Amino acid sequence: METTLDKSPVGREATIKTISTEPTGVRLLELGMTPGMEVKVLFKAPGGCPLAIEVGEHYVLGLRLEEAAFVTVYSTKH
């Protein structure tokens, strides 16, 4: 199932398919998020923002919903 990272449920593992080439997407690439990388939404604050995203096995990144919408992912486990 393909979706954007902002719509991915908490706890679901996913793989990054694409990242937008808009300035926000480029910033995410600079932070180390790349296509093919495993990610997981660890936490969504009340109201959905911010999100805590586990990126690979290396770090956790805090993102706004608007930023997470630039990342397209597909589920790797159901």
Each model region followed by its residue ranges:
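Compact, glycine-rich, soluble single-domain proteins
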Residues: 1-78
